[in-house]
Amino acid sequence: MNELEFVTLHRRHLHQYPELSLHEFETTSYITSFLEDLGVPYDRPLKTGVIAYLEGNSHHTIAFRADIDALPIYEENDIDFKSKNDNVMHACGHDGHTTALMLFVKRCKALYDKSELPHNVVFIFQPAEETGGGANRLIKAGAFDKYPIEAVFGFHVNPFEKEGKIVIRDEEITASATEYRFFLKGLSSHVADKEQGHSCGEGLQHVLSQIGQIQQFHLNGLKRNIIHMGHFEAGEAINTVPSHGYLEGTIRTYDTEDLAIVKHQMHKIAKSVQLLFNVECEVKFEEGYPPTMNHPQLRQAVENAIKGANLEIVEKKLPFLFGEDFSFYGQQLAPSYFVFVGTQNNEKGFVTGLHTAHLNFDEKILIDVVNYYEHLLRNYKEV
């Protein structure tokens, strides 16, 4: 079996059997069976996910990560390897990420068997990137305590960049993701006696209008930020004053000062609702993933590896506004570098975005990724 056949076989199997965050049991079994067949040792520090390891010819230890979970999306692709799990799909390309790392394990094991593996390698098949913060869970569980990891590398497919191109950026490359929720409690009454009630409906209207003002009047317009309202509700009947209200959304920013400003303004909005509409109003925040920071000291190694793999470098001027839990590795484990690999192919119709029901790509790009990884490994110099 050649490498294209390898990545096609494994990626399409994984694509047919996607599993949601923290439920990647069959995916984990598939990976461990593959590792056992190769004779590669591994650990399972969590219920799902796998950490594999090969010892090389130096004291340097480098880690490579792939996320393995899928999304609650019904697949609409008309393909013979369409998802067989109802309303679950690899709509973010993690089937490709996993397959690429499997091929990289295979290459590294071949080098190991010939005593030619240049450095120690940790292979991270990580669960729960989409929800659950699998990277942070692995770190907190001590999964890497026995490995003196010096650098962590990872990638994500990018359907908005053409095949053969890799997008890089020093410092922030993805945004932080913070969820916010407004809770309103008022007093219900019949609509004919609405003056007897305290309307959460009007309170919600105020929250909505004021959230829209934050970005316009309180944040630097030259920076990229998103304050998105995703869901709201109030009341239960058409002829009553709503006694409760709820609104939730997400904040995407790569600047901690901007995030602090947004939170401060939202607290002010909650207080103003209480004063203006005589309803209780509280806002709560759930911290998601911090910005993914690419460490500049790894830049030259990444550039050299991309060029060595005969791929094209695309310099990203501004960070992506995705959230990505790869950020925890750079924040808590070791210097890290995360890139985006182009998968766009207009002739084959591979043009739809991430988290859509039609995401697809040509498996050959996974070999490009592994070539890039191998160049990183062979030419790695201590940070």
Swiss-Prot record:
Give the enzyme's main class according to its UniProt record, as a single word: hydrolase
The keyword Membrane is annotated on this UniProt entry: no
Kindly indicate where the leader peptide sits in this chain.
none
> Which Gene3D superfamilies does the record match to this protein?
3.30.70.360, Zn peptidases
EC assignment: the record states 3.-.-.-
Example GO molecular function term? hydrolase activity
Per the record, the domain of life is Bacteria
InterPro entries, alphabetically?
A: Amidohydrolase, Bact_exopeptidase_dim_dom, Peptidase_M20, Peptidase_M20_dimer
Keyword list (alphabetical) reads: Hydrolase
Is S-adenosyl-L-methionine a UniProt keyword of this protein?
no
Q: What NCBIfam families would the database entry show?
A: amidohydrolases (TIGR01891)
- Family designation: Belongs to the peptidase M20 family.
By what name is this protein known?
Uncharacterized hydrolase SE_1078
